């Protein structure tokens, strides 16, 4: 546990000292407030823009960065020769990316939630199943491609599918906050378990299941590779 906490601190230090992370923390809340004040977007439209369309590709780059630190170097090839649990290595790097992403997302959501209201936070929580699916897809792509570039390509393809494939996905569309019926569920005016909202619950469960399946597939892949 001590070794894990040290590695977490090292990863967070690497991330926090990068120009990209500081730029993201500063610019995203400012851009969100400017867009909202322009009168072009409502709160649900803005939440969809930030959490469903922008934060998803942002999460892809964070996961890719976390895995590239080890996977794109000779360290990983040396690591798998030691009698260690390879699935723990995989889940540890996944946990690092989750800690970084959610920490930054919370930091960004604080000013937006304070200015725009609680719907911003609720929209973020509602989108978490999509992040789980996207993360699992990126990790599986990384293991299949044996390089973080494989995960990056898989993540971009997944992001493009949810961004432009709404007509094809229909009720499995990942971008839902822009719809009035979903907005009412997220805001608490309606309930998940009502008959007319059951498709929304199935939609979220689908993405949770997809994330779990992809992560399990990645674990099998890394164990098979190192066997």
Label each PLM-derived region with a short phrase:
Residues 91-117:
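Hydrophobic alpha-helical transmembrane segments that constitute the membrane-spanning cores
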Residues 65-99:
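Helix-loop-helix units of permease transmembrane domains in multi-pass membrane transporters
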Residues 1-24, 227:
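Aromatic- and glycine-rich beta-strand/loop motifs that create alpha-glucan
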Residues 122-150, 210-216:
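Hydrophobic alpha-helical transmembrane segments of polytopic membrane proteins
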Residues 35-46:
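Short, hydrophobic transmembrane alpha-helix segments
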């Amino acid at each position: 546990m001590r070794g894990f906490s040290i590695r977490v601190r090292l990863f967070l230090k690497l991330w926090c000292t990068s120009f990209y992370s500081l730029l993201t923390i500063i610019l995203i809340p400012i851009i969100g407030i400017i867009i909202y004040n322009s009168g072009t977007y409502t709160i649900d439209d803005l939440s969809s823009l930030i959490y469903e369309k922008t934060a998803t590709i942002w999460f892809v780059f964070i996961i890719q960065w976390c895995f590239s630190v080890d996977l794109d170097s000779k360290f990983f090839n040396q690591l798998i020769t030691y009698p260690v649990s390879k699935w723990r290595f995989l889940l540890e790097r996944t946990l690092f990316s989750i800690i970084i992403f959610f920490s930054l997302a919370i930091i960004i959501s604080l000013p937006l939630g304070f200015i725009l209201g609680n719907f911003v936070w609720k929209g973020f929580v509602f989108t978490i199943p999509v992040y789980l699916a996207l993360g699992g897809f990126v990790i599986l792509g990384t293991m299949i491609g044996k390089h973080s570039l494989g995960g990056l390509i898989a993540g971009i393809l997944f992001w493009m599918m949810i961004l432009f494939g709404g007509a094809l996905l229909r009720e499995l569309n990942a971008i839902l906050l822009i719809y009035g019926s979903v907005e009412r569920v997220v805001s608490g005016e309606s309930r998940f378990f009502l008959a007319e909202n059951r498709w929304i619950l199935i939609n979220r469960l689908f993405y949770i299941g997809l994330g779990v399946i992809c992560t399990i597939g990645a674990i099998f892949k890394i164990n098979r590779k190192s066997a």
